[in-house]
Amino acid sequence: MRYPQFYDMYRDAIKNTWTVDEIDFSTDLNDLDSKITPAERHLVNRLVAFFATGDSIVANNLVLNLYQHINAPEARMYLSRQLYEEALHVQFYLTLLDNYIPDMAEREAAFAAVENIPSIKQKADFCFKYMSSLNGVDELNTKDERRQFLMNLICFATCIEGLFFFAAFAYV
């Protein structure tokens, strides 16, 4: 095994397994109806929509860019587990949207936030810029190709997961 740290990360991630079905949303629904203001509810709806679309973008980057260029089996095991986590997060946020926003038109408007709300659209465009920077890069042979790959990795690990998501979680 060339990179035992990835195998250790994979094993640690397996220990952290959970499912959306384990979560009881009934208390949240009561709180949404009786304990928060309309402005706070609006914020919750926006955050959930942002997280659902954001984690979908992160999952796409894992599949389209990282997996292609990371070939060590133990590293791919960890990436596969991370992809599972991203899918689980998307399932969780979709379930939240289904529960928190029962009106289909409101739910569709929440999902359209990635296209219609300037701050969310700017974040998505930032992600797409770095995702598309690796289009056509089949191998990491040149210094520029490796730089593009590292920029993608830094963008997603630091800016998106570390800044965009954590800043949004601070509201919660």
Feature roles, as predicted:
Residues 1-172:
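Non-heme di-metal
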